Amino acid sequence: MSDKYVVETLLRPAVEFNSALVSLCAASICEFSPWAVALNPTIGHGAAACFMVFGYRRFKQGYRIIRFRRNILRLPDYALTSAQIPVSQRNLFLGKGFAWEQKHTQRLHNCMSPEVAEYVKPSYWYQRARAMEKRFEHTLPWLTKLLSSHSRFNPVRPLPPVGGSSLIHGVELDEEDVTMPLADRVGHTLVVGTTRVGKTRLAEVLITQDILRYCNGKGNRDNREVVICFDPKGDSDLLIRMYLEAVRAGRENEFYVFHLGHPEISARYNAVGRFGRVSEVASRISGQLSSEGNSAAFKEFAWRFVNIIARAQVELGKRPDYPSIARYVQNIDELFIDYATHFFNQQNPEIWQLISQQAAKVNDKNTPRNLVGRDPRVVAIDKYLTLNNKIYDPILGGLYSAVKYDKTYFDKIVASLLPLLEKLTTGQIAELLAPNYNDLNDDRPIFSWEEVIRKRGIVYIGLDALSDTVVASAVGNSMFADLVSMAGHIYKHGLNSGLPGEIAGKSDKVKINLHCDEFNELMGDEFIPLINKGGGAGIQVTAYTQTVADIEARIGN
């Protein structure tokens, strides 16, 4: 009767047991004493069978009522070991659950009604047991231990420590494994939940499957997927879990750790050393500066200035990095002289000799006012370029325009850039973000996104945002910008472009699973193109955040 009508009544006494008991008694009489009801024994057997079928049906209906009442009071403790997590090449396992329908809304509404409070609230003895735990915690510890035991033989055992409301899962009696097709992940996935409800634990489940997929000996090694996890907090449990799964999959040699909080064990990564266009270096650095109000003008100047420095370094055969850029921002004369030497020696070595001779004659009297305090060679170059205005090189011209600024004025307009660069080049972090490729004594690996993707690598990135949010945001966004650049390269040329013919001819389609915990902390201008256009390069983003409002507040829209 309980499931006959549209509106269910599951929060009530299980009256079905009454008719089930009566049916059992009637079946017993018909089977063992048919003469008592004036039945032929043969007919008695048939009547007993009918009563048993009816009684069994009523018992099932009553038991369903009991199950529902127990379900909404006590959420089952569902746990899986790592080996029990199903790994499929078609579907992604999410956990236990059900599709929310109208009946679940009705059931939840019924649970909120005060008339059924006796079925929804814990029993009197349960509440007494919890009170006794608090009261006798120190005086009778054995009693507290007994009452708090999670054994099924404890009738007042506490709820499992899973948090949340048991009503949400309790309104469905028959939960099943919930999966989503892997083909749908290219559209990206957003996981929303408040703090301490299990977002990171869900990330562990999904990352485990991504690491183990195609690692059971049946799949081609080239089908293995890239797994990258950005963790602003630097959760050690997540790091350990990823490493253990990599070992279990036989992929420990493909595992990289980049952790700003533990530079002694961290791999090294140059966030501005790889680029498709040299202008990307300036965008990655200046993108971390504020662009609100009057700061927008300083941000644009910082971009132009860093772009000039990066172009000059590349032309000189140097790899840009944070320390070198910070060095040249504070001493542009050095880079200007180095590039001028390179440029004039290419044009005519005698020109530089002439400039060197003029530099020896420079003094305070013949130095222009805006160049006071500059290196004598800078003054000599200025005089030569003034007299020979037909000589032009875009990089030399950019450096020359920066040098001509009054030094005091120049220091003011780069004032917003220097604090950021100081934070990125202070202490051991500088060794991570500007690796010395010639230091053979440093055995910490150096990685790039191109190398990681080609190796089908696994990367854990801990940004240690609790210690320094600015540095974490700057490094994270630079990594995203580098990844966007790499995605653009893959989209245009494929992953194996530039490799020998036999390798280049192989399929270069690879899935890149990007897991971003505390997504709102990482959200920036660099991340938006990664979401919008990264799917074409195989990037599949799974983002975890507390509320959608956090994302809106972060991007200001």
Model segments located where?
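Short, contiguous acidic/charged loop-to-helix segments that flank catalytic cores in large enzymes
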Residues: I72-P76, L466-V470, E521-L522, D550, ...
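Conserved ATP-driven motor cores of ASCE-family P-loop NTPases powering translocation/secretion/packaging/pilus
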Residues: I531-N557
